[in-house]
């Protein structure tokens, strides 16, 4: 792709690592993988849902399957030992990436951010929450957090409170001070909103939580892929994110937890791998993090996860952040040229790398369908934030989200496709 102006990253070189970006779309989808009748170039702007995977990560996974595929922690033969080393080292690599000095003992591999949230909610929340306690969230939470803690509160008798979102899409921090009090046992907050793009002051919220003896759980699904994150600087007690949003494979995520807290928690799932000893009467558990990883783990995905971290580190997370924020600001500026487009969230220079919006009198799903005909892949719906959309007074929104391989020209193609939709629905 021809570069219009300078970027914080080498877009052309990065795009060369992602063959999928060169494909065309628009043909018959009944036989996935056959693209002979596809004719429309792909413009992929759905990165908040999932990023694409570079060849370096695919190669690492293929190397595992071709070279040392074996179950881990269960064999003394060479392949098992080699796979075990790779899988354990992947934990250390991910820990290093997010600034977790405790290494593998503070990083649990899960399926995704949602499972990480459920692990803490069930393994910690069921034991620690009760009547008179409160869990504080925000009005912009993803369902992974909101629904999980909502249901745990119903089981335990705890109260759920929500920090207000103001008209600009930012948290009302004075309201947060009112809600986080001596009854609060958990503050669960999204770092970067997947709908508004808001970057929340998680360090300040961590301080508020700790002042009253509460823990804080940060949903980092949209932040770890897009900006430098140091969980110890934030002072998060728990922090979760997913591999598939950061150039990694699907089916793997990570839960960071402070070691002393994880030590005190019981397992979430039971079975093989997570036990130390078993009798007919009782069982004891493995050390961290393995007591939380029951059964055969996602070994190939772990290898790919580590490779994705290496890939992003080579680019530099400061550069990743600068690039996606540049594109988000450019998209914000382009979209604000039109009076019939409503944008949700803070201004373009004060958000993460996504823009959610609606075109007047056109449902988000209809707009998405028209954009799809132009080859532009965006996301339409409530983005797993139904209560937030209710607050915004809309059933759905259209979301464009950007990553390291996108360019301004693709934003221009988005705007051109919206123009085509506007003419069609006029």
From Swiss-Prot:
Regulation of protein activity: DTT increases activity up to 46%, but has an inhibitory effect at concentrations higher than 5 mM in vitro.
InterPro entries: Aminotrans_V_dom, Cys_dSase_SufS, Cysteine_dSase, PyrdxlP-dep_Trfase, PyrdxlP-dep_Trfase_major, PyrdxlP-dep_Trfase_small
pH dependence: Optimum pH is 7.5. Remains partially active at pH 11.
Catalytic residues in the record: 384
One example of a Gene Ontology biological process annotation: cysteine metabolic process
Listed PANTHER family: CYSTEINE DESULFURASE, CYSTEINE DESULFURASE 1, CHLOROPLASTIC
Assembly information from the UniProt record: Homodimer.
Protein family according to the UniProt entry: Belongs to the class-V pyridoxal-phosphate-dependent aminotransferase family. Csd subfamily.
UniProt-recorded name of the protein: Cysteine desulfurase
């Amino acid at each position: 792709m021809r570069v219009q102006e300078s970027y914080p990253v080498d877009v052309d070189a990065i795009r060369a690592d992602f063959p999928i970006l060169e494909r065309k779309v628009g043909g018959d989808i009944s036989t996935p993988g056959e693209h002979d009748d596809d004719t429309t170039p792909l413009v992929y702007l759905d990165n908040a849902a999932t990023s694409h995977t570079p060849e370096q990560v695919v190669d690492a996974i293929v190397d595992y399957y071709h070279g040392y595929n074996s179950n881990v922690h269960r064999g003394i033969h060479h392949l098992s030992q080699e796979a075990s080393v790779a899988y354990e080292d992947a934990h250390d690599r991910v820990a290093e990436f997010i600034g977790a000095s405790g290494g593998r003992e503070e990083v649990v591999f899960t399926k995704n951010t949602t499972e990480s949230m459920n692990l803490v909610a069930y393994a910690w929340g069921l034991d620690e929450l009760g009547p008179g306690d409160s869990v504080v969230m925000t009005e912009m939470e993803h369902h992974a957090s909101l629904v999980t803690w909502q249901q745990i509160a119903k089981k335990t008798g705890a109260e759920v409170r929500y920090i207000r979102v103001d008209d600009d899409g930012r948290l009302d921090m004075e309201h947060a001070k009112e809600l986080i009090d001596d009854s609060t046992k958990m503050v669960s907050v999204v770092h970067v909103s997947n709908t508004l793009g808001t970057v929340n002051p998680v360090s300040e919220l961590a301080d508020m939580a700790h002042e009253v003896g509460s823990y804080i759980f940060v949903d980092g699904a949209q932040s770890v892929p897009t900006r430098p994150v140091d969980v110890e600087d934030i002072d998060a007690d728990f922090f979760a994110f997913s591999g598939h949003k950061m150039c990694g494979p699907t089916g793997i995520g990570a839960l960071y937890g402070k070691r002393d807290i994880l030590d005190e928690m019981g397992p979430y799932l039971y079975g093989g791998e997570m036990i130390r000893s078993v009798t007919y009467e009782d069982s004891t558990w493995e050390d961290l993090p393995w007591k939380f990883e029951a059964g055969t783990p996602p070994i190939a995905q772990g290898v790919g996860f580590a490779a994705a971290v290496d890939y992003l580190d080579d680019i530099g997370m400061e550069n990743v952040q600068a690039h996606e924020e540049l594109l988000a600001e450019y998209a914000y500026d382009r979209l604000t040229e039109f009076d019939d487009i409503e944008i949700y969230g803070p201004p373009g220079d004060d958000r993460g790398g996504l823009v959610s919006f609606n075109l007047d009198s056109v449902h988000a799903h209809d707009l998405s369908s028209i954009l799809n005909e132009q080859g532009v892949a965006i996301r339409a719906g409530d983005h797993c934030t139904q209560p937030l959309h209710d607050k915004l007074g809309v059933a759905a929104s259209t979301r464009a989200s950007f990553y390291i391989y996108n360019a301004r020209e693709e934003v221009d193609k988005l705007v051109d496709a919206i123009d085509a939709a506007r003419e069609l629905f006029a």
